[in-house]
Design a protein with these regions (language model features):
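Conserved Switch II/interswitch segment of TRAFAC-class P-loop GTPases
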Residues: 79-98, 109-112, 122-129
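Switch I (effector-binding) loop of TRAFAC-class P-loop GTPase G-domains
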Residues: 27-54
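Switch II (G3) loop of P-loop NTPases
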Residues: 54-68
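Conserved beta-strand segments of the P-loop GTPase G domain that flank and frequently precede/overlap
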Residues: 59-60, 83-87, 117-120, 149
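Conserved alpha-helical scaffold flanking the Walker A/P-loop in AAA+ ATPase domains
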Residues: 43, 69-74, 105
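WD40-repeat beta-propellers
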Residues: 58-60, 93, 100
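Post-Walker A alpha-helix
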Residues: 22-23
Length: 214
């Protein structure tokens, strides 16, 4: 069974919910108050692709504060995918994504990097200030995946990473496999399908592995 590392970088303004998206994907948890990321940290989670191949996501959480922006460029090296996150209630976060983050990725990332846009905090739709159609059109311009997400309710979180895995692996169907606590992840062969399965290890393996960067 082969294992391939797959580097994903999340970028966007401070406070848009990058850390919360990762925490929800890795641990299925949400915290109202999270300290802003300084520098960058990464977490890991594996997906199982067709034929039993394992894609090990290395998910990098980067700082959105202006004073750390110059550091972000180094995280794009060898990245397979970049997710630009904006807050649907903050028009400024969308404009910065268009005018700054998209250009930073273009100038510093590998040519064939997979792009995705996460329209986060969809649970606050009544406070939305960003037109979704405009955001979707921008995603089309970049040939980027577009997913509306809520780190609080978990809406769209798995879909975001599923779509990235599909685009990379060529899979056409997605099955999320939730493991019972303490159960070891298993690879199940499925004939005549292209499937990516999100693996959810037991509690002893469930906490994200993080490395600090200063």
């Amino acid at each position: 069974m082969s294992i391939e590392s797959f580097k994903v970088v999340l970028v966007g303004e401070s406070g848009v919910g990058k850390t919360s998206i990762i925490t929800q994907f890795i641990d299925q948890t949400f915290q109202e108050d999270i300290q802003s990321t300084t520098g960058g940290t990464f977490s890991t989670k594996s997906v199982v692709c067709d034929g039993g191949k394992i894609l090990k996501f290395e998910i990098w959480d980067t700082a959105g504060q202006e004073k750390y922006r110059s550091l972000t460029t180094m995280f794009y090296k060898d990245a397979n995918a970049a997710v630009m996150v904006y807050d649907v209630t903050r028009k400024d976060s969308f404009e910065e994504m268009k005018n700054y983050w998209a250009n930073q990725i273009k100038d510093n990332s590998p040519e064939k990097i997979i792009l995705a846009i996460a329209a986060n905090k969809s649970d606050l739709i009544e406070q939305e200030t960003v037109d979704e159609e405009e955001a979707r059109n921008f995603a089309k311009e970049l040939n980027a995946i577009f997913v509306t997400t809520s780190a609080k309710s978990s809406e769209g979180i798995n879909s975001l990473f599923e779509e990235i895995a599909k685009k990379y692996s060529g899979a056409t169907n997605i099955t999320i496999k939730e493991e019972e606590d303490g159960e070891e992840p298993q690879v199940q062969e499925q004939k005549n399908t292209n499937t990516v399965k999100i693996e959810n290890p037991g509690k002893e393996n469930k906490k994200p592995k993080k490395k600090g960067f200063c």
